[in-house]
Amino acid sequence: MAKTLSDIKRSLDGNLGKRLTLKANGGRRKTIERSGILAETYPSVFVIQLDQDENSFERVSYSYADILTETVELTFNDDAASSVAF
């Protein structure tokens, strides 16, 4: 797991356009699971384009600190059926 925010951003920059599964803390013991594509990375946040058949909205954004504090977990799904997790 990456130790700094810049390491996390660098890792996500290398996975732009890849399909992923998102697991986020929704508060009050709720866990939200969504799937989509890593669309864009910015200096402070990253944007995930969600699958439209499963979700009522198009995009979500999270900060790199959410990954560092383990509020958000990303699992990248490769074509070879292996996965890389953050």
Curated annotation (Swiss-Prot):
<dbReference type="GO" id="GO:0006355">
    <property type="term" value="P:regulation of DNA-templated transcription"/>
</dbReference>
<dbReference type="InterPro" id="IPR009366">
    <property type="entry name" value="Protein_Veg"/>
</dbReference>
<dbReference type="GO" id="GO:0030435">
    <property type="term" value="P:sporulation resulting in formation of a cellular spore"/>
</dbReference>
<protein>
    <recommendedName>
        <fullName>Protein Veg</fullName>
    </recommendedName>
</protein>
<keyword id="KW-0749">Sporulation</keyword>
<keyword id="KW-0963">Cytoplasm</keyword>
<dbReference type="Pfam" id="PF06257">
    <property type="entry name" value="VEG"/>
</dbReference>
<dbReference type="GO" id="GO:0005737">
    <property type="term" value="C:cytoplasm"/>
</dbReference>
<comment type="function">
    <text>Stimulates biofilm formation via transcriptional activation of extracellular matrix genes. Acts by repressing SinR activity, independently of the SinI, SlrA and SlrR pathways. Could also be involved in the regulation of other genes during biofilm and spore formation.</text>
</comment>
